[in-house]
Regions:
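Secondary-structure transition motifs
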Residues: 44, 64-189, 282-308, 328-347, ...
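Short extracytoplasmic
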Residues: 44-68
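Low-complexity, intrinsically disordered
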Residues: 202-208
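Extended terminal
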Residues: 1-11, 148, 221-223, 264-270, ...
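Short acidic/polar mixed-charge low-complexity motifs
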Residues: 44, 210-212
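N-terminal type II signal-anchor transmembrane helix
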Residues: 1-43
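Extracytoplasmic/periplasmic C-terminal soluble domains
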Residues: 195-199
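Extended lipid/amphipathic-ligand handling interfaces
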Residues: 38, 51-54, 81-98, 110-114, ...
Length: 369
């Protein structure tokens, strides 16, 4: 018994010493290993200031992460982050589960760019990630089959920023700052007893002449065969004029106005119900330059009538409000969510314009009378 006890003690001490040695070695060898693997995955240089590994806690951290942009683009880095941390639950592997406690990005910066040739750096970047991920799954098929359950307890982005630059048209440049994003409890394969297992949260500020606020929160089931979600979203103070370059050409370009939007999106077993509440403030249009005979109807009305209503009759001082719903079955091959939403939006604007224009005309007639 004493011999077995001594052997056990020696084994434990040796195992702990091995972990400590590996812990110390990680500070010297982990950084170049991660840079090499990152370069292999993304096909561009990857730089890391510091990296560390905690064998006892099952955690990996990196500081000063930079992913170089592809050749042909002016932005230096496509992605950078002050800190990236990954925490694993290694004991979960004993039950054929692979649990990631947390993936955290602090101060990440994503620089999306369209160069003068019309090439988009984001397309190549994300395609490389998907391609290499598929190769890894195929190469590690034994490990993938051994694990029967995957759980991501939390994915979080703190104080993130996304910058979009179009070298062909500077009016399309866009910046989104102060991004807070999180996913909680992502499970694969999905548990049939959990209708909406994953919580979603997004809060961001859109920079520009006037700052807009975006908020999204709710719950989803991303891997279920039949879509289910319960999402609430809002947009406040988004400037129309600032994003005119992103909109389709119109005979009535918007020169002023802000958008306030609330959305409640529900879906259960592919039955979708999305309710929109829209409030447009200080809306003004610029008359198109096309001859009158060539100007198409806008929202089913003559463009000059809309310009007169918003620009000349004091309508911009008041909010223009309307709401519309999108109902449908995602299993129906004839149902197109975007087409139905656009059709219902056009109808709602036309109906509200008709009501408000009629009210203005009646008020003007009473004044004259």
């Amino acid at each position: 018994m004493n011999i077995l006890r001594k052997i056990l003690i020696v084994f434990v001490i040796g195992f702990v010493a091995l972990l400590v040695a590996a812990q110390i070695a990680s500070y010297f060898f982990l950084k170049p290993i991660l840079e090499r693997e990152g370069r292999h995955l993304l096909r561009v240089p990857v730089y890391i200031e510091k990296a560390g590994l905690n064998f006892f806690g099952g955690s990996l951290w990196m500081k000063g992460v930079r992913v170089k942009n592809s050749p042909g683009f002016q932005e230096r880095d496509i992605l950078s982050a002050r800190t990236v941390a990954i925490d694993l639950n290694l004991l979960s592997l004993l039950t054929h589960e692979f649990t990631v406690r947390r993936i955290l990005f602090k101060d990440p910066q994503l620089a999306l760019e369209i160069n003068e040739q019309g090439e988009f750096n984001g397309a190549a970047f994300f395609n490389r990630i998907l391609t290499q991920s598929r190769k890894w799954v195929q190469g590690e098929r034994r490990f993938v089959q051994l694990v029967t359950h995957y759980i991501l307890e939390k994915f979080a982005v703190r104080n993130g920023a996304v910058q979009f630059v179009d070298r062909r048209n500077s009016d399309r440049n866009l910046s989104v700052r102060f991004i807070s994003f999180s996913l909680a409890r992502v499970v694969y394969p999905p548990d049939p007893e959990e209708a909406l297992p994953t919580a979603v949260y997004l809060n961001a500020t859109v920079s520009g002449d006037s700052e807009g606020k975006i908020l999204v929160l709710g719950r989803i089931n991303p891997f279920a065969s039949e879509k289910s979600f319960d999402i609430t979203g809002s947009v406040k103070g988004l400037s129309f004029a600032q994003y005119q370059a992103f909109m389709s050409p119109s005979p009535l370009p918007i020169t002023e106005g802000t958008l306030q939007l609330k959305i409640k999106a529900l879906c259960h077993d592919n039955q979708v119900d999305i309710h929109h509440q829209v409030r447009l403030e200080r809306l003004r249009f610029s008359p198109g330059e096309l001859p009158e005979a060539q100007v198409p109807l806008v929202f089913g009305m003559k463009p000059e009538a809309i310009v007169r209503f918003f620009n000349e009759r004091g309508a911009p001082a008041n909010a223009f409000e309307f709401d519309f719903r999108v109902l449908g079955d995602l299993d129906d091959p004839n149902f197109n969510l975007l087409s139905v939403a656009n059709e219902n939006l056009q109808r709602a604007i036309h109906e509200q314009l008709t009501v408000q224009m009629k009210a203005v005309e009646e008020k003007a007639a009473q004044v004259v009378g």
